[in-house]
């Protein structure tokens, strides 16, 4: 079993991992940038070391300093969390070369799923449904135009190395397409160091449904149900729930099996998420991508299954078999998560860095808060704006919505602006309450002024 883990991350996910390690009797090492010396993960870990200046590229992405800190502290494993180095195959390979366990899949699996055009082709061969589109990277704009004419507009241009809503453009005309391909290639070369793009048919009316999978190094893989992440703003998720109000039992079982097939096709191990576009009008689903890491929204799955996904990741990385089979997985009730960001929803979600003067999280039965915030904590402006995740669990969707409204009303954060007022309005919106909406929900409805 792993004895000591270095957590190569910050914020709430670093705190979450440290807590899981402590319960497993594993020692923890926190790393931090100069801007994060007062951060909560630094205070609760057994040891903590500064790995560089405030900017991510000099600290949380500084592989040399992270590996040398792991070696210096005698850490036998590194947990990358999400973001930063979590889906970096080179870093996973570096860990392997240095005899450090990377708590995640193999570099080969990350490569296969991280390069989006390769992932598409792998899924096609495995029989997992994919959106109609190019077979691999397009050579030039001529090929793109020919494909788009064949499929029909609109089409979506995607950077093969992109992710997190970046490197994506929709084209509705040939002119849009030519311009879009050129711009996306340039942006992708700068942002990801890989100019490759591919195109897909753009399905306009869909829901974003993802399946949580878990696999070990002994050939076992299971799914732990779906999460509906349809409420998004600028391709960034804001609210997640499980089960999805749009799925029936038959589609749920099919998608779950497709996700397991996807994981087995790349010899996957650890926690992963297979994202699907769900065309609910025609009851068809298509593979979108696989995230080869733990997701921000993993707690909703934990609430309905009772499985601690972080602990399971650590056990699997230690060489253990999965602690449960597909038959052992049961789903109980409904869970919703709201991402509380340091942003001002009244001012077009403008980031709001600063000092938290008062912090009073909600409590009560079925309420969970995953956060690294505390009174007096200054939010650095250099990283992601999420400061807390508020998760509720209840018997039904209606009860979960009421519980979330109560919890949001109790949540006090003063000194900065947060998205709490937005979430309160969203949960009162009749379209959200009905459960019938698509990814354009926030484009169609002005939630703040409704």
What do these predicted regions represent?
Residues 57-58, 110, 167, 298-300:
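A generic structural signal for short coil/turn motifs at secondary-structure boundaries
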Residues 2, 7-24, 48, 71-73, ...:
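ATP-dependent carboxylate activation and anion-phosphoryl transfer catalytic cores
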Residues 1-126, 138-146:
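ATP-binding N-terminal substructure of ATP-dependent carboxylate-amine bond-forming enzymes
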Residues 133-134:
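Conserved beta3 strand of the protein kinase N-lobe
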Residues 147-156:
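Acidic/histidine-enriched active-site and ligand-binding environments that engage anionic O-linkages
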Residues 159:
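N-terminal nucleotide-binding beta1-loop-alpha1 segment
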Residues 38-39, 87-88, 113, 140-142, ...:
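Short secondary-structure boundary/hinge segments and terminal tails
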């Amino acid at each position: 079993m792993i004895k000591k883990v270095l957590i190569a991350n910050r914020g709430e996910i670093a705190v979450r991992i440290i807590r899981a390690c402590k319960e497993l009797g594993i020692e923890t090492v926190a790393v931090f940038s100069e801007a994060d010396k007062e951060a909560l993960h630094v205070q609760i870990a057994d040891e903590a070391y500064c790995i560089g200046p405030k900017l991510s590229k000099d600290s949380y992405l500084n592989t040399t300093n992270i590996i040398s800190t792991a070696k210096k502290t005698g850490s036998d494993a590194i947990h990358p969390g999400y973001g930063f180095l979590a889906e970096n195959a080179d870093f996973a390979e570096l860990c392997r070369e240095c005899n450090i366990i990377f708590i995640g899949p193999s570099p080969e699996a990350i490569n296969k799923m991280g390069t989006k055009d390769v992932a598409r082709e792998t899924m096609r061969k495995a029989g997992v449904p994919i959106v109609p589109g190019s077979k691999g990277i397009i050579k030039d704009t001529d090929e793109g135009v020919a494909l788009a004419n064949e499929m029909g507009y609109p089409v979506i241009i995607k950077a093969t190395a992109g992710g997190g809503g970046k490197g994506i453009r929709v084209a509705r005309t040939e002119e849009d397409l030519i311009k879009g391909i050129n711009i996306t290639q340039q942006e992708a070369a700068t942002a990801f160091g890989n100019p490759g793009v591919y195109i897909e048919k753009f399905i306009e009316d869909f829901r974003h449904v993802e399946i949580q999978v878990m696999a070990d190094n002994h050939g076992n893989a299971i799914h732990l149900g779906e999460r509906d992440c349809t409420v998004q703003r600028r391709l960034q998720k804001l609210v997640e729930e499980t089960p999805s109000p749009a799925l029936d039992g038959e589609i749920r079982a099919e998608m779950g099996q497709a996700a397991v097939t996807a994981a087995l096709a790349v010899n996957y191990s650890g926690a992963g998420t297979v994202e699907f576009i769900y065309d609910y009008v025609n009851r068809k689903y298509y593979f979108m991508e696989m995230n080869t890491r733990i997701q921000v929204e993993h707690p909703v799955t934990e609430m309905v299954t009772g499985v601690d996904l972080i602990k399971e990741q650590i056990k699997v990385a230690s060489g253990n078999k999965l602690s449960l089979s597909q038959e052992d997985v049961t789903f109980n009730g409904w869970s919703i998560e709201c991402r509380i960001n340091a942003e001002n929803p009244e001012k077009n979600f403008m980031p709001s860095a600063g000092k938290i003067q008062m912090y009073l999280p909600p409590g009560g039965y079925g309420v969970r808060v995953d956060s690294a915030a505390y009174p007096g904590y200054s939010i650095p402006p250099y990283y992601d704006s999420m400061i807390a995740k508020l998760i509720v669990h209840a018997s039904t969707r209606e009860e979960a919505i009421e519980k979330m409204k109560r919890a949001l009303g109790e949540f006090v954060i003063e000194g900065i602006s947060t998205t709490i007022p937005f979430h309160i309005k969203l949960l009162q919106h009749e379209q959200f309450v009905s459960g019938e909406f698509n990814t354009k929900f926030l484009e169609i409805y002005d939630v703040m002024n409704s």
